[in-house]
Amino acid sequence: MKEFDLESYDYYLPKELIANYPVLPKEKAKLLVYERRSQKITHTTFEHVLDFFPKNALVVLNDTKVMKARLFGSKHALLPSKTTEVFFHRFFKDNTALTQIKGKIKAGDKIFFDANYHAEVLELLHNGQRLIAFYNHKTPLNQENILKLLEQYGHMPLPPYIKRTDESLDAHEYQSVFAKHIGAVAAPTASLHFSQNTLEKLLKDFKHAFLTLHVGAGTFLGVETKDIREHQIHTEILHIPKKSQEILRESQEVLCIGTTALRSVEYFKRLKNSNQESFECDIFLHLANPIQHVNYLLTNFHLPKSSLLMLVSAMIGLEKTKEIYKIAIEKKYRFYSYGDGMLIL
């Protein structure tokens, strides 16, 4: 069936429609609103986004905060050039970290960030990740100090399709105004559209709940299996506080700000009587595993053959997704992380 064929999720996007910078002010970004019942499409901007939110819906937001996850160092302590890139993925046990390191590397190699700080490669893992430990001279760094190191020396982890180095504006624009709990290596991009003023109005006028899904490096990986149902999606750390869990259980209508919030809600709602607050979320939503517990979605325009495009198709159908993306391209909407948005009602 074509809805399970990976090639069905391919499309052509002119390079000039890939957004390399955000629209400022945020309210001026374009917004495509699609109402499923009437099939109506409205073209507007984000200054009007809350006018379209159903009044009785619970709005769910992901308050993860992006780390400065890209570090550059040298394999030799005395070399001034920092050409070895370390992409921090997540903490592992005993203050070690899972990373991706560009170039040839072997266990025992060291990467120097300055005269004091370095990392040592502990193990090369089968999935391309590298297990490393960070040190200040010979003293291992704990998680708190590793985060300080990232903040001091790291760069914002812009997606690979943004063909430029990070700049000072990315430190705040590639971060939502409600980002709170650090741990993501990519921004939940629908959240980037909210200015402080729009957020305050949302929190005042709508029932809402916060959760934290730390977006992982796997979000940039495309689906590679010919049959999308065979794809194994990456695992991400999810935290839903008890207060938010109670609100989610009580709510009939749910509007999610972004696919990360939607995946989190779907994962949580499918659990049987869990008393936990922290989870390992690995839910892959597509037409064979459709959305059951979320009614509305605010999202960006996603990459061809990506799991996020399949999620959108699970909500509105493959053909309708293709139709709307074709319209968005014709109307010169800007795509991907710094691009424009789409509200599905």
Swiss-Prot record:
Pathway(s): tRNA modification; tRNA-queuosine biosynthesis
Entry annotated with the keyword Plastid: no
Gene Ontology MF terms: S-adenosylmethionine:tRNA ribosyltransferase-isomerase activity
Keyword terms of this UniProt record: Cytoplasm, Queuosine biosynthesis, S-adenosyl-L-methionine, Transferase
Catalysed reactions, as listed in the record: 7-aminomethyl-7-carbaguanosine(34) in tRNA + S-adenosyl-L-methionine = epoxyqueuosine(34) in tRNA + adenine + L-methionine + 2 H(+)
Enzyme Commission number(s): 2.4.99.17
Keyword Transferase found: yes
Top-rank taxon, per record: Bacteria
GO cellular component terms given for this protein: cytoplasm
Pfam families referenced in this protein's UniProt entry, alphabetically: Queuosine_synth
Gene Ontology terms describing biological process: queuosine biosynthetic process; tRNA wobble guanine modification
Compartment(s) of residence: Cytoplasm
First-listed, main subcellular location of the protein, grouped into a coarse class: cytoplasm
InterPro entries linked: QueA (IPR003699), QueA_dom1 (IPR042118), QueA_dom2 (IPR042119), QueA_sf (IPR036100)
Subunit organization: Monomer.
Function per UniProt: Transfers and isomerizes the ribose moiety from AdoMet to the 7-aminomethyl group of 7-deazaguanine (preQ1-tRNA) to give epoxyqueuosine (oQ-tRNA).
NCBIfam families in UniProt: PRK00147.1, queA
Family to which the UniProt record says this protein belongs: Belongs to the QueA family.
Protein name (database record): S-adenosylmethionine:tRNA ribosyltransferase-isomerase
Organism: Helicobacter pylori (strain HPAG1)
Gene that specifies this protein: queA
